[in-house]
């Protein structure tokens, strides 16, 4: 009785939560009765704690409404429901669309003696063992992506299939792909895990066509256990490649074989890609990987310095992190330059030394990101007038973008709160502080605000 009501509860949660929240937190749960207790199994500690903190009241309220005093007790546990041939999982009320081609994944692997043996190279060797979950620096900007990736590594082909990670360059998407691959291979050394850039898929298909080996190409890609494709946006306007990937995608998903894709944009925003593909990209879980916040940037620098055997003073790490905000790759490149200069000159790494070593990079960053530039970018994004940034108007359509611009100015520039207030029509520092706190709160509560803020960060940092 309680387990069947859990399915009804799932329907309630699906109505009340966003698609991403439902896919991320509710879909992976499995339910089983243990006496008078309904046990909800979560795939990992992160999901368990989140559901217990955020959704326990909604779940309890639903069961009380349906069963009154007979409502079961709830208990959370980590793992899979034991002795269950087919776990009761959270499934969407609306069924996934039927595949347009009902193709079973072929069992034969790609013939290395075919006319184009290079295409059948051991792609598993492309999984970089350096990239592990253990050395992925986690912060608010990427914790959902990491949690989803870890779940995929433990349960490939399960709830998050496909997993779609999107965000700007150098934010750690590729690191997570390799970490998942390493996790899958660790649990199953015989797993056929293929990682590649989307352009490699296109090149392989072109070679197969040239060598009359397209059937071998199809068999190879449809027989893998996990397929990870980086920068899927490069499929844009390549119609034949999209057609072939469409059928490969269908075959792999029908066989419960894991697919992970990355892009620099949200699936529906990718130009030049067929709607039927963009629709499929969103069937599983879509997660944004955002630019790292200050604390995460500092942690990345400290981790990188430690790996390089360098003692990086805290104040130096904060100095660099406050000025370079766009992506991890930029941070690591700057630190490598500092380390190289220190090794060459024999000088200690101090703030003054970093100013000198990164003089051109810091000057460029300060030139690119100004309060004026932020105001113009935000005004254009929200389709308001630049003058509204400085006006006293308090309507939400104007006040909210103004608050976003203030928060971005605090995060992306080195100006003080009073200086930011002056730039916004002579407002005082308490107004700026309130705006920063309000936007931080909305980023936690509103998916739209979170997306808008991330989009603006990417635009201003590019």
Curated annotation (Swiss-Prot):
Q: Which SUPFAM superfamilies would you find in this protein's record? A: P-loop containing nucleoside triphosphate hydrolases, TrpR-like
Annotated region (Domain III, AAA+ region), positions in chain? 126-342
KW Secreted (keyword) present: no
**Region: Domain II, residue numbers:** 84-125
* InterPro entries (alphabetical): AAA+_ATPase (IPR003593), Chromosome_initiator_DnaA (IPR001957), Chromosome_initiator_DnaA-like (IPR020591), Chromosome_initiator_DnaA_CS (IPR018312), DnaA_C (IPR013159), DnaA_dom (IPR013317), DnaA_N_dom (IPR024633), DnaA_N_sf (IPR038454)
Membership in a protein family:
Belongs to the DnaA family.
| Protein name in the entry | Chromosomal replication initiator protein DnaA
Tell me which Pfam families the record gives: Bac_DnaA, Bac_DnaA_C, DnaA_N, Hda_lid
Gene Ontology CC entries for this record:
cytoplasm; plasma membrane
* Xref: HAMAP family: DnaA_bact
Write the gene name.
Answer: dnaA
Q: Where is this region: Domain IV, binds dsDNA?
A: 343-462
Assembly and partners? Oligomerizes as a right-handed, spiral filament on DNA at oriC.
Q: Locate the residues binding ATP.
A: 170, 172-174
Where does this polypeptide localize? Cytoplasm
Q: Which organism is it from?
A: Shewanella sediminis (strain HAW-EB3)
Checking PANTHER family in the record gives: CHROMOSOMAL REPLICATION INITIATOR PROTEIN DNAA
Extract one GO molecular function annotation from the record.
lipid binding
| Domain remarks | Domain I is involved in oligomerization and binding regulators, domain II is flexibile and of varying length in different bacteria, domain III forms the AAA+ region, while domain IV binds dsDNA.
